[in-house]
Amino acid sequence: MLETDVIVVGAGPAGSMSAIQLRNYGLTVLVLEEHSAIGKPLHCSGLVTPRTLESAGMDHSLVLNEIKGAEIFVGDVKPLVLGNEVTRALVIDRVAFDKYLANQAVLKGAQLNLGHRVTHIENTPSGTTIVHANQKTFSSRILFGCDGWRSKVSTHLGNTKKDLIWCFGGEGIVSNHPKDMVRVYLDAEIAPNWFGWTIPLDNKRVRIGIGTTFGSPERKPIHLFNKLLKQYPTHFEGLTITSLSGGFIPLYTPQVIESRNSLLIGDAASHAKPTSGGGIYTALEGAKTAAHTAYQALSSIQAGPVQLNSYHSAWSKTLGKELVRGSELRKVFMDLQSNNQLPTLINTLSIKPLKKMVHNYGDIDYPSALVNPILRVASAMIGPALQLSKMSRASLPLKRFVSQLASQK
């Protein structure tokens, strides 16, 4: 049995970028992907920032549409319209995106085995990891878990609890949707603890989705999806649905993401952003950190067990800190939504100085960057920050968040 430096389980963005980076360091890499085709089944909305394409080392050839802003709806209040002429996000061909990264990994020299579902993992006293897949046995000195929210590697590390968002959606054709604007729906009755969305692919095609926390049968996303269509009929006039899909988003929660010789990256590590559910950018950046950690470990110990205990601290100093802040922001959002305070927030953010702050500082990848500017403007406009009318109950988690934000600076 030939031993590989690193076995990567999963050939999504996390796995393929890991393989690319590991090969850049001259390490031997085997990628095991359970599906027979890269990028399928599709479970992602495909909305990313330009920063994500840069991180992937990719040009705009896979971009289907450019997004300049958002329309945010909740209840009967006037929608909050954000955006200008600046491109804020990109709609990508997600299947082609995954294929591109996987092909780059193969071109770099990684071995890719499709249709290989990992069934068992074991560690040996010598420091080697044995991986069983498709009645075959593989061995490596280091194991990367990039195998999504149901990660076999994560289970091997002892993780059992995840904060899952249950999603349902698809693609369709509508009569009228702004080509350069996404729509976000915050109503608690159609997306409890999360939100709904429409993302235009072009002048007529849209991606539609809804999400909620895993819970009671009446919260099944397919039922909430139908509620969304009924509650906003003018938005879905002439809708013809062309495809449907569902899945889960593992929002950031503290997990064991490293062991002596195993690392978790991307959704396997529950590294999806708590505010938006996006996980591609965090997966790409996590893969780079993980690959560097593996290279350093293998360079320092030529034989025998390795130690990967620097990965968590390195990750925590970069995007890890933002994910912690994002978790606090999500608590604020859920409190506002459950207390029916989101309409008040939408009205407040429509005030010109606050809206300007959102335009200037809003960032899908780093949402916490918006908090302090908003609070400064709010404080100057209406007295002490957080004393927004009708929001006293909902202000407490925001106070906790600001306190934590200040302590981490």
What are these regions (language model features)?
Residues 1-12:
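Beta1/beta-strand and adjacent pyrophosphate-binding region of the FAD-binding site
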Residues 11, 104-237:
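Predominantly flavin-linked oxidoreductase catalytic cores and closely associated redox partners
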Residues 15-16:
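N-terminal Rossmann-fold NAD(P) dinucleotide-binding loop
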Residues 20-42:
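Glycine-rich FAD pyrophosphate-binding loop
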Residues 35-56:
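Conserved N-terminal glycine-rich FAD pyrophosphate-binding loop of Rossmann-like flavoproteins
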Residues 49-100:
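A conserved beta-strand/loop capping segment in the N-terminal third of enzymes
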Residues 120, 216-299, 305-306:
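FAD/FMN-dependent oxidoreductases across multiple families
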Residues 295-409:
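C-terminal helical "tail/cap" subdomain of flavin- and related membrane-associated enzymes
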